[in-house]
Each structure stands twice: as structure tokens, then as C-alpha cells.
């Protein structure tokens, strides 16, 4: 069961909720939708839709960070080991100096994978020797994992994952949820 919640008031189709925290998936069911992440109105094939979701999640996370006051740049070059640059501060302004953080974005449902380098989607030509690797501090400073069903963002210092396995359940990372 997902822990994502949404404050809402809906006055359509006989659904009324008065500022109660309602689990997101129940909200979407009440509105006639199954969930936010499995709506594919255009009928794209599964591989293309997965790639599009990854791109969309990069922009959603960038938007959240910008709304929080961070400067963000999405890296639009394939093959890089990080997805975005985030300008943060060592200490709160005005005393703290700016620091540029390399961030790797991951989409999470029940867990976050810390493995990269694999080929997503449909590969029309099989090539052996594709190298997957676990992210390290040589690759990025942060892993930003977005929960695909409610857009909570888990802010994970890359140095943490050196002690973890190849993935971790988001239920075990609650202190990192939206911890800016």
C-alpha cells in the first residue's frame, strides 16, 4: 500500500471529501482513473512510454526543485552519468557558498534501483556486453528518486548507496522523502 496522500475537495460525480487525507490511488479510482502512472491515452508501446515517463519525471523533479528556489539544469546529452545539475548551498544563504551537485534521477514505485547503464525499451539489434553498473560518487552526488504514483522525491546522497544493495524499498527511506 502506497503512503502517498493528497488533500482534495471534489464536487463532481457525487464525490465529496473535506480536506481529509485520502490515499492517492483511491482518489483516482473515485474520479474514474486507476492511477496517475498508467494513463497512456495515445497508445504508445510500452518501451516508448517508459522512456517518456523517465523524461517527464526529470522535468517534474526539475520543476519541484525550481519551485523550492534551486537553480536546476537538465543535462540533455545521452551517455552522461548524471541527469541534472542542481545549485545548492553549503549553508543557508547568505553565509553559504554555492555548490554544484550532479544528480541522477530514478523513477520509483516500491523501490529504487541504483543500477544504471542498461538499455531501456525495445532494442531492435541485440548487442552483448552491455555494461550495467551501480552508481557511485564518481557518477553523481545525489540520487533523486521520484515516486511515480504521487511525485514524492527521495533525496539520496550517492555515498549512502555504497553501503546498500542494488536497490532499496522506499518504505525504508522515509527520512529521505522530500527532505530538501
PLM regions: where:
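Mixed-charge (Asp/Glu-Lys/Arg
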Residues: 1-80, 86-180
Amino acid at each position: 500500500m502506497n503512503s502517498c496522500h493528497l488533500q482534495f475537495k471534489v464536487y463532481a460525480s457525487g464525490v465529496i471529501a473535506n480536506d481529509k487525507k485520502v490515499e492517492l490511488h483511491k482518489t483516482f479510482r473515485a474520479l474514474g482513473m486507476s492511477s496517475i502512472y498508467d494513463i497512456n491515452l495515445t497508445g504508445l508501446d510500452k518501451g516508448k512510454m517508459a522512456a517518456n515517463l523517465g523524461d517527464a519525471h526529470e522535468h517534474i523533479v526539475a520543476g519541484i526543485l525550481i519551485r523550492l528556489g534551486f537553480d536546476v539544469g537538465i543535462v540533455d546529452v545521452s551517455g552522461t552519468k548524471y541527469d541534472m545539475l542542481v545549485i545548492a548551498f553549503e549553508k543557508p544563504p547568505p553565509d553559504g557558498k554555492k555548490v554544484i551537485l550532479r544528480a541522477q534521477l530514478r523513477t520509483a514505485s516500491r523501490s529504487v534501483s541504483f543500477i544504471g547503464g542498461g538499455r531501456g525499451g525495445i532494442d531492435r539489434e541485440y548487442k552483448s556486453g552491455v555494461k550495467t553498473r551501480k552508481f557511485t560518487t564518481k557518477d553523481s552526488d545525489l540520487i533523486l528518486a521520484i515516486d511515480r504514483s504521487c511525485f514524492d522525491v527521495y533525496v539520496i546522497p550517492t555515498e549512502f548507496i555504497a553501503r546498500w544493495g542494488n536497490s532499496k524499498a522506499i518504505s525504508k527511506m522515509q527520512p529521505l522523502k522530500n527532505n530538501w
